[in-house]
From Swiss-Prot:
Coiled coil: none annotated. The gene is lpxK. It catalyses: a lipid A disaccharide + ATP = a lipid IVA + ADP + H(+). Its EC number is 2.7.1.130. It is an enzyme of class 2 (transferase). One of its GO terms (biological process) is lipid A biosynthetic process. Belongs to the LpxK family. Keywords: ATP-binding, Kinase, Lipid A biosynthesis, Lipid biosynthesis, Lipid metabolism, Nucleotide-binding, Transferase. GO terms for cellular component: plasma membrane. It comes from Chlamydia trachomatis serovar D (strain ATCC VR-885 / DSM 19411 / UW-3/Cx). Transfers the gamma-phosphate of ATP to the 4'-position of a tetraacyldisaccharide 1-phosphate intermediate (termed DS-1-P) to form tetraacyldisaccharide 1,4'-bis-phosphate (lipid IVA). Pfam families: LpxK (PF02606). This is Tetraacyldisaccharide 4'-kinase.
Length: 369
């Protein structure tokens, strides 16, 4: 019961971010956000304090998480990790809570199938992962301990998506991803800032990865909290695919491209900066809260706005694309998804060592079970 209580508090606070970042309203209610942030940090401390001994399963459990509310680029990392382990001959499943998906509340787990499910059913991130990973390997259930128990016999490795704060399951490897431009979520707990956990808990992570470059002061603080070498990654555009056009856009056509951009991300500034770094001219934006999809009316109005500014199309992330589904085909103005992958720009040797360590743990478990 207490875990449902804490989950309910977390969901409520995440929902409040819509109001907490709304300009003048946020300024007027700053005192309220500070009070709620104090309560939230207390609930986080209490949850860690009363956590019981975690349950162990026979498969190797690898957690990928963060310490802030959204916006670190965790989904592309989970995708890369699952594919990298698969290339090493390890069977791997992604276990997700299925946040914002109505099927996550079912007593039985759901195997995500892009041909059958929508983002409203299973959540946008699990649906996106299932688009690229082998059939049957992305599973959702709110009770991830039970989900792990039911999946452990079928896979070598279980990737626990957003698992750093999940205390009910033993994790063999803890990976934490932080955003290089704001690794500590503004220095305050949500909703005053973006923290969802204490930065000091980075000491418990086996590997800390940084998405983008840090300022020297943030890098020093990260090194103080987690002395081991950090792995630095950077997202890059791999391709732009039009959802309602018969042709795609060659890379040499990106320079100077005038577009509108809509997205529902925890940290949209990073996505917009990546587009601008690629030479794409952003004529206007329509920003939604994390995990929230755009409606047909909103998209049509935004398209008209960008047409008036002489734009050639609308771009969104793949996470937004899976939420709109076939809606793009009802729009005559070009709508495209930006496909991203990351590259390791610092300490690739440690990233390979991380994969080696996961493989070694799995082999040892196989021998002892």
């Amino acid at each position: 019961m207490r875990f449902s209580f804490f989950s309910g508090i977390r969901d409520l606070f995440r929902h409040l971010i819509i109001s907490a970042t709304s300009g003048a309203l946020s300024d007027r209610l700053g005192w309220l956000w500070a009070v709620i942030a104090r309560v939230f940090s207390g609930s986080v401390w209490l949850r860690h304090k009363i956590a019981k001994s975690p349950h162990q399963v026979q498969a190797t459990v690898v957690s990928v998480g963060n310490i802030v509310v959204g916006g670190t680029g965790k989904t592309p990392l989970v995708l890369w990790l699952a594919q990298a382990l698969h290339e090493r001959g390890l069977s791997c499943a992604v276990l997700s809570r299925g946040y914002k998906g109505k099927y996550s509340k079912k007593k039985a787990f759901t195997i995500v199938n892009p041909a059958l499910h929508t983002a409203s059913c299973v959540g946008d991130e699990p649906l996106l992962l299932a688009k690229y990973l082998p059939s049957g390997t992305v599973r959702i259930q709110k009770d991830r301990k039970t989900l792990a128990e039911k999946s452990a016999g079928d896979f070598d490795v279980l990737l626990l998506d957003d698992g750093f704060q999940y205390n009910r399951l033993h994790k063999d490897v803890e990976i934490v991803l932080v955003n290089g431009s704001d690794p500590f979520g503004g220095g305050s707990f949500f909703p005053k800032g973006r923290l969802r956990d204490f930065p000091e808990r980075l000491a418990k992570a086996d590997y800390v990865m940084i998405n983008g470059r840090c300022s020297p002061s943030d890098q020093r603080e990260l090194d103080r909290l987690h002395p081991e070498e950090k792995i630095v990654i950077e997202p890059q555009i791999s391709e732009i695919v039009w959802l309602n056009q018969s042709v795609n856009m060659p890379r040499d056509h990106w320079e100077g491209l005038g577009v509108g951009v809509f997205c529902g991300l925890g940290f949209p500034k990073g996505f917009l900066a990546m587009l601008r770094d690629a030479g794409i001219h952003v004529l206007g934006t329509y920003l939604l809260p994390d995990h929230v999809g755009i409606t047909k009316q909103e998209l049509e109005l935004f398209c008209k706005k960008i047409i008036l500014r002489q734009g050639v199309g609308i771009l969104c992330t793949e996470k937004d694309s899976v939420k709109i589904g076939a809606l793009a085909e009802e729009i005559s103005f070009p709508v495209g998804e930006v496909r991203m992958r990351f590259s390791c720009v610092c300490n690739e040797r440690r990233m390979v060592a991380m994969l080696d360590a996961i493989e070694a743990i799995q082999k040892n478990k196989r021998v002892t079970t």
